[in-house]
Amino acid sequence: MKDLKNQIMRKTTLFIFSLLFISSILFYPKTTFAYPFWAQQNYESPREATGKIVCANCHLAQMPTIAEVPQSVGADSVFKAVVKIPYKNDLKEIGADGSEVPLQVGAVVMLPDGFKLAPQERWTEEIKEETEGVYFTNYSEEKDNIIIVGPLPGDTNKEIVFPVLSPDPSTNKEYHYGKYSLHIGGNRGRGQVYPTGDKSNNVVFTSSTSGTINSIDTIEDGSYKVNIENENGEITTEAVPVGPQLIVKAQDKINAGDPLTNDPNVGGFGQLDAEVVLQSPYRVIGLIAFFIGVGLTQILLVLKKKQVEKVQAAEGI
Protein backbone atom coordinates (compact mmCIF):
# COMPACT_ATOMS: atom_id res chain seq x y z
CA MET A 1 0.00 0.00 0.00
CA LYS A 2 2.85 2.38 0.90
CA ASP A 3 4.69 1.59 -2.40
CA LEU A 4 1.49 2.30 -4.36
CA LYS A 5 1.08 5.63 -2.57
CA ASN A 6 4.69 6.57 -3.34
CA GLN A 7 4.21 5.71 -7.02
CA ILE A 8 1.07 7.85 -7.20
CA MET A 9 2.91 10.77 -5.56
CA ARG A 10 5.83 10.44 -7.97
CA LYS A 11 3.61 10.30 -11.03
CA THR A 12 1.55 13.26 -9.83
CA THR A 13 4.71 15.33 -9.25
CA LEU A 14 6.09 14.37 -12.67
CA PHE A 15 2.76 15.24 -14.33
CA ILE A 16 2.72 18.70 -12.69
CA PHE A 17 6.34 19.29 -13.67
CA SER A 18 5.61 18.26 -17.27
CA LEU A 19 2.63 20.63 -17.47
CA LEU A 20 4.75 23.50 -16.14
CA PHE A 21 7.58 22.74 -18.54
CA ILE A 22 5.30 22.49 -21.60
CA SER A 23 3.57 25.73 -20.58
CA SER A 24 6.93 27.45 -20.25
CA ILE A 25 7.92 26.34 -23.74
CA LEU A 26 4.63 27.53 -25.24
CA PHE A 27 4.36 30.85 -23.46
CA TYR A 28 7.94 31.73 -22.48
CA PRO A 29 10.23 30.15 -25.08
CA LYS A 30 12.88 32.81 -24.66
CA THR A 31 13.80 31.77 -21.11
CA THR A 32 13.66 27.98 -21.27
CA PHE A 33 16.66 26.71 -23.17
CA ALA A 34 19.28 24.09 -22.35
CA TYR A 35 18.23 23.11 -18.85
CA PRO A 36 18.33 19.56 -17.43
CA PHE A 37 15.32 18.55 -19.55
CA TRP A 38 17.49 18.69 -22.67
CA ALA A 39 20.07 16.39 -21.09
CA GLN A 40 17.27 13.90 -20.41
CA GLN A 41 16.32 13.97 -24.08
CA ASN A 42 19.83 13.47 -25.43
CA TYR A 43 21.86 11.44 -22.93
CA GLU A 44 21.18 8.13 -21.22
CA SER A 45 23.23 9.33 -18.25
CA PRO A 46 23.98 12.95 -17.30
CA ARG A 47 27.60 12.07 -16.48
CA GLU A 48 30.13 11.01 -19.09
CA ALA A 49 32.85 8.41 -18.53
CA THR A 50 35.34 11.27 -18.12
CA GLY A 51 33.33 12.55 -15.14
CA LYS A 52 31.98 15.59 -16.98
CA ILE A 53 28.29 16.33 -16.48
CA VAL A 54 26.74 16.73 -19.93
CA CYS A 55 25.17 20.12 -19.14
CA ALA A 56 28.67 21.50 -19.78
CA ASN A 57 28.32 20.54 -23.45
CA CYS A 58 25.78 23.35 -23.94
CA HIS A 59 26.81 25.71 -21.12
CA LEU A 60 30.40 26.45 -22.06
CA ALA A 61 31.18 29.09 -19.45
CA GLN A 62 32.33 27.89 -16.03
CA MET A 63 30.95 29.35 -12.82
CA PRO A 64 31.10 28.00 -9.26
CA THR A 65 28.55 25.65 -7.78
CA ILE A 66 28.59 24.90 -4.06
CA ALA A 67 27.09 21.89 -2.28
CA GLU A 68 26.35 21.24 1.38
CA VAL A 69 25.94 17.57 2.32
CA PRO A 70 26.10 16.07 5.83
CA GLN A 71 29.29 14.20 6.63
CA SER A 72 27.36 11.11 7.70
CA VAL A 73 23.74 9.94 7.74
CA GLY A 74 21.86 7.06 9.29
CA ALA A 75 20.12 4.27 7.41
CA ASP A 76 16.57 4.96 6.18
CA SER A 77 16.85 8.63 7.13
CA VAL A 78 15.97 11.86 5.33
CA PHE A 79 18.71 14.46 4.92
CA LYS A 80 19.22 17.63 2.88
CA ALA A 81 21.62 18.06 -0.02
CA VAL A 82 21.80 21.81 -0.64
CA VAL A 83 23.00 23.09 -4.03
CA LYS A 84 24.05 26.75 -4.12
CA ILE A 85 24.17 28.55 -7.47
CA PRO A 86 25.61 32.03 -6.78
CA TYR A 87 25.49 35.04 -9.09
CA LYS A 88 24.93 38.79 -8.82
CA ASN A 89 21.43 39.90 -7.86
CA ASP A 90 19.11 41.20 -10.60
CA LEU A 91 21.49 40.05 -13.35
CA LYS A 92 19.89 39.96 -16.81
CA GLU A 93 20.74 37.97 -19.92
CA ILE A 94 19.52 38.02 -23.50
CA GLY A 95 16.64 35.77 -24.49
CA ALA A 96 16.22 33.99 -27.80
CA ASP A 97 14.38 37.06 -29.15
CA GLY A 98 17.20 39.39 -28.11
CA SER A 99 15.37 41.00 -25.20
CA GLU A 100 16.72 41.13 -21.65
CA VAL A 101 15.31 38.46 -19.34
CA PRO A 102 16.04 37.37 -15.74
CA LEU A 103 18.40 34.45 -15.28
CA GLN A 104 16.99 31.04 -14.49
CA VAL A 105 18.73 28.20 -12.72
CA GLY A 106 18.80 24.42 -12.87
CA ALA A 107 20.56 21.65 -10.95
CA VAL A 108 21.24 17.93 -11.11
CA VAL A 109 22.18 15.68 -8.19
CA MET A 110 23.50 12.19 -8.94
CA LEU A 111 23.05 10.16 -5.78
CA PRO A 112 24.66 6.78 -5.06
CA ASP A 113 22.58 3.71 -5.89
CA GLY A 114 19.94 3.17 -3.23
CA PHE A 115 19.67 6.85 -2.33
CA LYS A 116 16.67 8.67 -3.81
CA LEU A 117 14.31 11.61 -3.49
CA ALA A 118 12.56 11.31 -0.13
CA PRO A 119 8.78 10.74 -0.34
CA GLN A 120 6.82 13.86 0.59
CA GLU A 121 5.18 12.27 3.63
CA ARG A 122 8.64 12.10 5.22
CA TRP A 123 9.52 15.73 4.59
CA THR A 124 9.79 17.88 7.69
CA GLU A 125 7.97 21.20 7.88
CA GLU A 126 11.31 22.91 7.38
CA ILE A 127 11.97 20.96 4.17
CA LYS A 128 8.45 21.69 2.89
CA GLU A 129 9.04 25.39 3.42
CA GLU A 130 12.48 25.32 1.80
CA THR A 131 11.25 23.45 -1.28
CA GLU A 132 8.07 25.43 -1.89
CA GLY A 133 7.69 26.08 -5.61
CA VAL A 134 10.46 23.62 -6.52
CA TYR A 135 9.53 20.60 -8.66
CA PHE A 136 11.79 17.56 -8.61
CA THR A 137 11.86 14.86 -11.23
CA ASN A 138 13.94 11.73 -11.75
CA TYR A 139 16.31 11.70 -14.70
CA SER A 140 14.54 8.58 -15.97
CA GLU A 141 12.29 5.82 -14.66
CA GLU A 142 15.34 3.54 -14.38
CA LYS A 143 17.46 6.13 -12.55
CA ASP A 144 15.55 7.27 -9.46
CA ASN A 145 18.88 8.14 -7.81
CA ILE A 146 19.40 11.02 -10.28
CA ILE A 147 17.27 14.08 -9.51
CA ILE A 148 16.94 17.18 -11.66
CA VAL A 149 15.41 20.58 -11.02
CA GLY A 150 14.78 23.54 -13.32
CA PRO A 151 14.39 25.87 -14.91
CA LEU A 152 13.50 28.01 -11.88
CA PRO A 153 13.62 31.78 -11.32
CA GLY A 154 17.22 32.39 -10.26
CA ASP A 155 16.80 35.35 -7.93
CA THR A 156 14.64 33.28 -5.54
CA ASN A 157 16.34 29.91 -6.01
CA LYS A 158 20.06 30.45 -5.58
CA GLU A 159 19.91 27.65 -3.00
CA ILE A 160 18.01 24.49 -3.94
CA VAL A 161 17.29 21.94 -1.22
CA PHE A 162 17.09 18.29 -2.30
CA PRO A 163 15.37 16.03 0.31
CA VAL A 164 17.19 12.69 0.10
CA LEU A 165 16.26 9.31 1.57
CA SER A 166 19.14 6.97 2.43
CA PRO A 167 18.88 3.18 1.97
CA ASP A 168 18.70 0.65 4.79
CA PRO A 169 21.26 -2.15 4.39
CA SER A 170 19.58 -4.13 7.17
CA THR A 171 16.50 -4.63 4.98
CA ASN A 172 18.19 -4.61 1.55
CA LYS A 173 21.46 -6.52 1.27
CA GLU A 174 22.29 -4.83 -2.07
CA TYR A 175 23.46 -1.78 -0.12
CA HIS A 176 26.22 -1.48 2.44
CA TYR A 177 27.40 0.91 5.11
CA GLY A 178 30.35 3.06 4.12
CA LYS A 179 31.43 6.12 2.14
CA TYR A 180 29.56 7.15 -1.02
CA SER A 181 30.13 9.80 -3.69
CA LEU A 182 27.61 12.32 -5.04
CA HIS A 183 28.03 14.19 -8.33
CA ILE A 184 26.40 17.61 -8.44
CA GLY A 185 25.91 20.21 -11.16
CA GLY A 186 24.40 23.69 -11.04
CA ASN A 187 23.68 26.13 -13.83
CA ARG A 188 22.55 29.72 -14.19
CA GLY A 189 21.51 31.27 -17.49
CA ARG A 190 21.08 30.03 -21.05
CA GLY A 191 23.53 27.88 -22.95
CA GLN A 192 25.82 28.82 -25.80
CA VAL A 193 25.17 25.73 -27.91
CA TYR A 194 21.95 23.89 -28.65
CA PRO A 195 21.86 20.10 -28.20
CA THR A 196 21.95 19.89 -32.02
CA GLY A 197 25.36 21.60 -32.01
CA ASP A 198 24.07 24.91 -33.41
CA LYS A 199 25.05 28.15 -31.69
CA SER A 200 22.49 30.05 -29.66
CA ASN A 201 22.48 33.85 -29.67
CA ASN A 202 24.13 33.79 -26.23
CA VAL A 203 27.69 33.44 -27.49
CA VAL A 204 30.48 35.34 -29.26
CA PHE A 205 30.19 35.21 -33.05
CA THR A 206 33.49 35.11 -34.94
CA SER A 207 34.65 35.46 -38.51
CA SER A 208 35.29 32.27 -40.48
CA THR A 209 37.61 34.03 -42.91
CA SER A 210 40.20 36.80 -43.19
CA GLY A 211 39.62 39.96 -45.18
CA THR A 212 37.90 43.34 -45.11
CA ILE A 213 34.33 43.96 -44.01
CA ASN A 214 32.68 45.08 -47.23
CA SER A 215 29.30 45.95 -45.71
CA ILE A 216 26.95 45.16 -42.83
CA ASP A 217 23.26 44.57 -43.56
CA THR A 218 20.70 45.10 -40.81
CA ILE A 219 17.77 42.71 -41.10
CA GLU A 220 14.20 43.57 -40.15
CA ASP A 221 14.23 41.37 -37.02
CA GLY A 222 17.33 43.12 -35.67
CA SER A 223 19.88 40.53 -36.81
CA TYR A 224 22.85 41.29 -39.08
CA LYS A 225 24.66 39.97 -42.11
CA VAL A 226 28.35 40.85 -42.13
CA ASN A 227 29.84 40.65 -45.64
CA ILE A 228 33.59 39.98 -45.66
CA GLU A 229 35.70 40.27 -48.81
CA ASN A 230 38.91 38.26 -48.94
CA GLU A 231 42.06 39.12 -50.91
CA ASN A 232 40.69 37.26 -53.95
CA GLY A 233 37.56 39.39 -54.02
CA GLU A 234 35.31 36.57 -52.75
CA ILE A 235 32.51 37.54 -50.37
CA THR A 236 31.72 35.50 -47.26
CA THR A 237 28.56 36.40 -45.35
CA GLU A 238 28.45 35.85 -41.59
CA ALA A 239 24.98 35.77 -40.00
CA VAL A 240 24.71 37.34 -36.56
CA PRO A 241 21.38 36.78 -34.76
CA VAL A 242 19.55 39.36 -32.69
CA GLY A 243 21.05 39.82 -29.23
CA PRO A 244 24.86 40.07 -29.41
CA GLN A 245 26.25 43.54 -30.14
CA LEU A 246 28.50 44.08 -33.15
CA ILE A 247 32.01 45.34 -32.32
CA VAL A 248 33.10 45.73 -35.97
CA LYS A 249 32.20 48.16 -38.74
CA ALA A 250 32.50 48.41 -42.50
CA GLN A 251 36.08 48.60 -43.85
CA ASP A 252 37.55 46.92 -40.75
CA LYS A 253 40.26 44.38 -41.55
CA ILE A 254 39.84 41.10 -39.68
CA ASN A 255 41.41 37.67 -39.46
CA ALA A 256 39.73 34.29 -39.28
CA GLY A 257 38.60 33.68 -35.71
CA ASP A 258 38.35 37.35 -34.78
CA PRO A 259 35.19 38.26 -32.82
CA LEU A 260 32.44 40.11 -34.64
CA THR A 261 30.36 40.62 -31.48
CA ASN A 262 30.69 41.07 -27.75
CA ASP A 263 30.18 38.13 -25.40
CA PRO A 264 26.57 38.45 -24.17
CA ASN A 265 26.73 35.48 -21.81
CA VAL A 266 26.52 36.23 -18.09
CA GLY A 267 25.77 32.71 -16.83
CA GLY A 268 27.65 29.46 -16.52
CA PHE A 269 27.75 25.89 -15.28
CA GLY A 270 29.71 24.32 -12.44
CA GLN A 271 30.03 20.81 -11.06
CA LEU A 272 31.62 19.14 -8.06
CA ASP A 273 31.76 15.88 -6.16
CA ALA A 274 30.76 15.37 -2.53
CA GLU A 275 30.91 12.46 -0.09
CA VAL A 276 28.55 11.12 2.53
CA VAL A 277 29.03 8.22 4.93
CA LEU A 278 26.13 5.83 5.48
CA GLN A 279 26.70 5.19 9.15
CA SER A 280 26.04 1.82 10.78
CA PRO A 281 24.11 2.13 14.07
CA TYR A 282 26.35 -0.57 15.56
CA ARG A 283 29.42 1.52 14.79
CA VAL A 284 27.81 4.52 16.48
CA ILE A 285 26.99 2.39 19.53
CA GLY A 286 30.57 1.08 19.52
CA LEU A 287 31.99 4.61 19.38
CA ILE A 288 29.75 5.70 22.25
CA ALA A 289 30.83 2.68 24.28
CA PHE A 290 34.48 3.46 23.48
CA PHE A 291 34.17 7.08 24.61
CA ILE A 292 32.36 6.01 27.77
CA GLY A 293 35.15 3.50 28.44
CA VAL A 294 37.83 6.17 27.90
CA GLY A 295 35.97 8.54 30.23
CA LEU A 296 35.60 5.92 32.96
CA THR A 297 39.28 5.00 32.65
CA GLN A 298 40.29 8.63 33.12
CA ILE A 299 38.02 8.96 36.16
CA LEU A 300 39.46 5.78 37.70
CA LEU A 301 43.01 7.03 37.08
CA VAL A 302 42.22 10.32 38.81
CA LEU A 303 40.65 8.50 41.78
CA LYS A 304 43.62 6.14 41.97
CA LYS A 305 46.04 9.08 41.90
CA LYS A 306 44.19 10.80 44.73
CA GLN A 307 44.19 7.56 46.74
CA VAL A 308 47.95 7.22 46.29
CA GLU A 309 48.47 10.84 47.33
CA LYS A 310 46.44 10.26 50.51
CA VAL A 311 48.50 7.17 51.40
CA GLN A 312 51.73 9.05 50.77
CA ALA A 313 50.54 11.97 52.90
CA ALA A 314 49.59 9.62 55.75
CA GLU A 315 53.02 7.97 55.66
CA GLY A 316 54.71 11.37 55.60
CA ILE A 317 56.32 10.82 52.26
Swiss-Prot record:
InterPro entries in UniProt: Cyt-f_TM, Cyt_f, Cyt_f_lg_dom, Cyt_f_lg_dom_sf, Rudment_hybrid_motif
Cofactor note: Binds 1 heme group covalently.
GO MF annotations, alphabetized: electron transfer activity; heme binding; iron ion binding
Signal sequence range: 1-34
Gene3D superfamilies assigned: 2.40.50.100, Cytochrome f large domain, Single helix bin
Location relative to the cell: Cellular thylakoid membrane
Spans through the membrane: 284-304
Binding-site residues, heme: 35, 55, 58-59
GO aspect biological process, one term: photosynthesis
Free-text function comment from the UniProt entry: Component of the cytochrome b6-f complex, which mediates electron transfer between photosystem II (PSII) and photosystem I (PSI), cyclic electron flow around PSI, and state transitions.
Protein name as catalogued: Cytochrome f
Organism listed in the record: Prochlorococcus marinus (strain MIT 9312)
